Amino acid sequence: MSNVWHNRTLALAGIIQALNSVQQIARQGNAPIDTVAASLASVFKMNPKSAEDVYGNIEGVSVGLQVLNQQLNRKSYRTDPELLRYLTNIMYLEQRLKKRPRILAQIADQIKHIEPQTEELSPADPLIIARLADTYVNTISTLTPRIQIRGEETHLRQPENIERVRALLLAAIRSAVLWRQMGGTRLHLLFQGRQLLYETHTLLKRIPRAGAA
């Protein structure tokens, strides 16, 4: 049972981490490159051996786990309604996506064509990001409702930021797929927050220099 929640928590942290980076780009014009790279790398894990393998290891979603802890911990007073709205929208889009096998196949095909470039380039390289952004536009962006990102217009109008946001939304969808594969549902978010918080604490303790507040 604990292993199930372990996997669900990792997947949820993966979604949160990608969306948190989206917020940082929208609000500040940038996000930590290592965190962005870790999220984008998950897109290329098409046949992972485990949930942890999707992110390389637990450290791959360390930021997501810390932010998730803040959202689930009522004592932190750091609940972010905007982040939760993005999370709900991503999960809704993933539900629609699973009913569109042609789009799923298109995504898989495009990712397979991009993947060889990651042998020489970082997942956060502008070239990789541009191609992932195109994949998002050609597939997920055709579904409704489209996710509306809020932030500073000066940041959101910059082409490189637009591409980074789209690539990260694709990464969020990838983690949402994992969440569903692990049996996660929106009801779990509503009624199993305490279980998710417990598992978040457990995972954070395994990460050097990370801790649960």
Curated annotation (Swiss-Prot):
Its main location: cytoplasm. Keywords: Cell inner membrane, Cell membrane, Cytoplasm, Membrane. The keyword Membrane applies. It holds the Pfam family DUF489. It is found in: Cytoplasm; Cell inner membrane. Gene3D superfamilies: HflD-like. InterPro entries: HflD, HflD-like_sf. It is a peripheral membrane protein. The keyword Cell inner membrane applies. Belongs to the HflD family. This is High frequency lysogenization protein HflD homolog. It comes from Nitrosococcus oceani (strain ATCC 19707 / BCRC 17464 / JCM 30415 / NCIMB 11848 / C-107).
